[in-house]
């Protein structure tokens, strides 16, 4: 699943990958949803708060940057929350490239991990 290459009309639209063992699928899917479903730009896609819910966990793990309202809503639905730091490496360290309709590429290195997006 990592790296993943998404095509739009047969052309590259998004390239994404992250380390994180069992957490890789959740991280990659969250980033794809941020870009495809919510239309976020590459930096917002990569820096948005993350969560993880695994079948083996009794907790819904999430970054503390989720709003109090969102956290309260999750608790009301019966979730036990496990809060992590604002940009916690627990949720991966993704690298993303988004390609617009003109072919221009935009890269992002996850703020949770050291890195830089560069091109030429």
Task: Enumerate the language-model features and the residues they cover.
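Cofactor-centric catalytic regions
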Residues: 65-120
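Proteins synthesized as precursors that undergo proteolytic processing into mature forms
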Residues: 1-87
């Amino acid at each position: 699943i990592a790296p993943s290459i998404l095509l739009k009309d047969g052309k590259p639209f998004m390239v994404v990958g992250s380390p994180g063992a069992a957490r890789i699928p959740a991280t990659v899917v969250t980033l794809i949803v941020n870009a495809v479903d919510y239309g976020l730009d590459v930096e917002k896609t990569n820096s948005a708060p993350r969560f993880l819910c695994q079948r083996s966990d009794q907790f819904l793990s999430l970054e503390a940057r989720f709003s109090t309202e969102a956290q309260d809503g999750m608790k009301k639905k019966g979730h036990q929350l496990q809060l992590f730091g604002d940009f916690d490496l627990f949720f991966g360290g993704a690298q993303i490239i988004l390609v617009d309709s003109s072919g221009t590429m935009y890269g992002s290195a996850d703020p949770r991990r050291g890195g830089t997006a560069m091109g030429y």
